[in-house]
Amino acid sequence: MVCLPKQMRFVLLALIVLASCAAAAAQANDTQTAHTGHSLNELIDKRRVVLVVFRSRVVDVGENRERAIIEDVLKADPKPKGRFRWVYNTMARKLNKYMDKYGSLTAAEGLADAEYVIYFNVVEFRRILDTVYPYGELFVIIKGSPEQLKPPRIVWRANKVRYAGDAIGDLIKDLKTVRGES
């Protein structure tokens, strides 16, 4: 057995702890990236988008959850109602700034005209310092094409429940990265 001074033991122990923390963080980051399903590369050549905001009735947490969400979104009315109109306007303002600046997106008239759908599922409204903030999940759904036998699918989702403005900001940041816009 090798005898090490107390200071060397402490340094060696600190290095082992740091190495294990770094490995755990890298593994957590890999699972988080895999969970969010980033494949925005499919959106590079698609321009027409529609924004849909409503509270989903889907409570299934199994594999059928994505299919149920897609069915709800594709049957939904894209015009928001009630409190959701305010959430829609908050998100649309940020999307419109992106559209005006880069010109890589255009607003579709309805679901029939859109190539993909940006869907915000309102989970809750939080009241902080007498101000209401909408929180929810953001999804990007490609409508698919029956000619090529490609079903509608979720190609991107926020990795957690977020404030509406932050969620759309994350999507815009990822779109800029994928499309090479800066």
What residue ranges belong to the model's regions?
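A structural "domain/chain start" motif
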Residues: 25-97, 179-182
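Short, amphipathic alpha-helical "lid/cap" segments that border enzyme active or binding sites
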Residues: 164-176
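Bacterial N-terminal signal peptides that target proteins for export
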Residues: 2-12
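Intrinsic disorder/low-complexity segments
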Residues: 21-22, 26, 160
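Bacterial N-terminal signal peptides
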Residues: 11-20
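Short, flexible helical or helix-coil boundary motifs
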Residues: 19, 145-147, 179
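Surface-exposed short loop/turn segments
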Residues: 89, 93, 97-107, 111-166
